[in-house]
């Protein structure tokens, strides 16, 4: 049996990961084990590290975090037929999901257990580093666009579906979630309006956005409203601080679907110095009540996205099994944003956290293993 090592979150709010031995996770009947060639980091990883008593309260430490992996299949459960040892894959590691809560399914280790329906074959031309940028962004975008409790759009296909005649607004097009959402929406037959900084206009357009707007412009919402004239809204996906409020302003003045899928959580502009947990909860609840009430007055509904929900409703299979392998092979879906490699080895994951905290634009921080 192989030996395994992991970058453990040793305790709640412990400031540094600890790299040490971890159990090798043999697969259950409906699981596979992947030897990771690369992993990606996401803001949720270092937010759990710094605010562990506010979110993901069910985690029992020490714990292995991480959601994005790419590597080679080394073991398959007896009921798995779609994968074989040696297959190159990417996968959404769902260890932090409340219904899973299992370090063996965390990304930040040498070997990770994956669910076949959240795993996709990748072409030989695609590096593990590039593939690792996809899983969580794909799942989050897919949940927001296609789940029935979200926008409920028709599913993507490869090749893309014919145009529906509807337009979806994606606020934050150069983010990881936004980059995936643009491509998914286009593959599903929707026109995409998105926002980005001016330096990322070309980037968003290459992913398939029909129109890109400068989110820093003081007239951005009015510019989008004017562009929607004569068009029918399919709803909005809001990513990043301030995106939800801006999407509400736009949807209040356009025809069609008035629903916002919320991919980001509001955070206080200033970190509370005392009673941190209580004050943060009060801020969060107050924001939700205020936002929902404003939406009620305008006839606009909204819902927060939980990426792991795609594992429980068939959307995960539709994305990772039915769509992504063919789309990657045909070049109709590209890994985006580009990978920015922070280093090699599990010891580099904490460094990757720090790099991402500083902010990146149209990039995703990746660690080679």
From Swiss-Prot:
Domain Enoyl reductase (ER) span(s) in chain numbering: 13-367
EC id: 1.-.-.-
Molecular function GO terms recorded: nucleotide binding; oxidoreductase activity, acting on NAD(P)H; pigment binding
Membrane-topology descriptor: Single-pass membrane protein
Keyword Cell wall biogenesis/degradation: no
Enzyme class per UniProt: oxidoreductase
Presence of the UniProt keyword Transmembrane in the record: yes
A Pfam family per the record: ADH_zinc_N
Pathway(s) this gene product operates in, as recorded in its UniProt entry: Secondary metabolite biosynthesis
InterPro entries named in the record: ADH-like_C, ADH-like_N, GroES-like_sf, NAD(P)-bd_dom_sf, PKS_ER, Trans-enoyl_RdTase-like
Main location: membrane
A cellular-component GO term for this protein: membrane
Induction remark: Expression is positively regulated by the azaphilone pigments (MonAzPs) gene cluster-specific transcription regulator pigB.
Annotated transmembrane regions: 280-300
Binding site for NADP(+): 44-49, 197-200, 215, 360-361
Cellular localization per UniProt: Membrane
Keywords linked to the UniProt accession: Glycoprotein, Membrane, NADP, Nucleotide-binding, Oxidoreductase, Pigment, Transmembrane, Transmembrane helix
Domain of life from the UniProt record: Eukaryota
Family listed: Belongs to the zinc-containing alcohol dehydrogenase family.
PANTHER family, sorted: HYPOTHETICAL OXIDOREDUCTASE (EUROFUNG), ZINC-TYPE ALCOHOL DEHYDROGENASE-LIKE PROTEIN C2E1P3.01
Function text: Dehydrogenase; part of the gene cluster that mediates the biosynthesis of azaphilone pigments (MonAzPs), a complex mixture of compounds with a common azaphilone skeleton very widely used as food colorants. Within the pathway, pigH might be involved in the late steps of yellow pigments monascin and ankaflavin biosynthesis. The first step of the pathway is performed by the nrPKS pigA that forms the hexaketide precursor from successive condensations of five malonyl-CoA units, with a simple acetyl-CoA starter unit.
Protein name, per record: Dehydrogenase pigH
Organism listed in the record: Monascus ruber
Gene name in the database record: pigH
